[in-house]
Amino acid sequence: MSTARPTTSAALVSLATAHPPFRMPRAEWLEIADTLTPPEVDRALLTRLAERSGIETRWCAAFEEGRHGFYRPNEVPGTAERMMLWSRAARALSADAAKRSLADAARAGITAGSITHLVTASCTGFAAPGIDAFLIETLGLSRSVSRLNVGFMGCHAAVNALAAARATVLANPNAVVLVALAEVSSAHFHHTTRLDQLVANTLFADGGAAMIVAAESPATQTRSPALATIVDTHSTLIPHTSEEMAWHIGDRGFEMTLGASVPAILEREIRAWVERALATHGLGIRDVAGWAIHPGGPRVIDAVAAALELPDSAVAASRAILRDHGNMSSVTLPFIFERLAQDPAAELRHDARSEAGPTPWVGLAFGPGLAGEMIVCHAART
C-alpha cells in the first residue's frame, strides 16, 4: 500500500448560516410553550427546564412573533401538516445559506455554475422532490449536478455530509461540492406530559447552513485561501446504548427519546475514541486549538469538557451558540465553526501547537445510536 500523501486536499472554501425571521427570547418562548402544554404540566417545571437549557434566544419557523403560529392550544397537527411546514421553512433556510455561501466563494472564482455535486442534509423532515431539487432551480445550478441526501442521521449529519464532500473532491479534484443543511425542529413541538419530550421542546430550534468544498493542490494553490482544510472524519457507535437516544416518525410528528444518562455515557466513553482518532493524525487532545462541541444541552457540553479535560474557554463557542440559537440539530456545528472562523483567537487553547505548525480544529457531535462523529480540520490562519 502506498504511503504517499495525496496531491490534493479538501478545502472548506466558504461557510454561511441562516435562521428564520422570528426571534424568540426565552420569556416569549416560555409563554407560548405554557399555552401549548397540557394543563397538568406545572408551569414551574417548564420554567426550570427553560432556565437549565442555557438558551436565551432561538429562531423558530413554526411561531409567528407574539403568536402561536403553526400551533393552536389543544390542537395537535399530524405528521403530514408538519412536513408541509418543514418543506416551506427548510427550502427558505437552505437557499438563504447557500446564496450567502456562494457569494463568499466568489473570492475563489466559484459561482453557481461551478457546482458539480450537491449534498443536502436534514433530520426534521422529508419531501420528494426535496431541498436538492429546489436549490438547483433557485440557485441556477446545472441540471446535471450529482445529488446526495443525508437523511435522518440526527445532530451529527453535518459531519456525515462533509465526509461525503471530502471523499468526492479527493476522488475528483475538479469537483466543487455545495453542502446544504436545514433543520426545522419547531415542526415537532409536542403537546405532551412526557419529560423527555418536554426537554426536547425546550432545547431545539431552527436554522440552516451551507458550505462549499473544493480540491486544493498544495503545489499550485490555484484557489484563494480556504477557511480550513478538512483533514478527516471519524465515527463511533457506543455499544449497548441504542435505547438512550432515538428519533422516531410518529402519527403526530417526529418523536424524540432522550435518556437522562446520555451525558454520563459520553463522559465515560468518548475520551478513548477521541484520543485514538487524533493519534492517527499525530495529534493529542492538547494539540487542538479550536473545539466545536455540538451542544445537545448544557450537560452534554459539560460531559465532553470533563471527559477531555477542556478549559471553559475551549467550549465557550459551543455554549454561546446554544445560548443565542438553541440546539439546531445538524446545523449547529457549522454555526460553531463560523464563530471560530470569525473570532478564532477568543476560543484557542493556549497549549495548542505553535504558530509554525497547523491550527487543528475538531468538531464533535452525537446522535441516536449512541453515535459519535468527529471532523478534524486545519484552520486557515488569520
Regions found by a protein language model. Name each.
Residues R143-S144, V150, N160-A164, L181-D206:
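Active-site glycine-rich loop that binds ribose-phosphate moieties when present
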Residues A97-I115, T220-T222, A272-A289, L340-R353:
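Phosphate/pyrophosphate-binding loops at sites that engage ATP/ADP/AMP, CoA/4′-phosphopantetheine
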Residues L85, D96, S101, A246-L322:
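A contiguous, well-structured pocket-lining segment that forms one wall/lid of small-molecule binding clefts
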Residues I55, A89-A106, A164, G208, ...:
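Short, well-ordered amphipathic alpha-helical segments that serve as non-catalytic structural scaffolds
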Residues S2-S87, V176, H191-R268, A272-R276, ...:
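Condensing-enzyme catalytic core mediating Claisen C-C bond formation in acyl metabolism
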Residues S53-L141, F152, I285-I301:
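Conserved beta-ketoacyl condensing-enzyme motif
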Residues P6, C123-G125, G130, S142-S144, ...:
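Claisen-condensing/thiolase-fold acyl-transfer catalytic domains that form or cleave C-C bonds
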Residues A127-A133, V179-V199, D232-G250, G297-A306, ...:
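Active-site-adjacent elements of ketosynthase-type condensing enzymes
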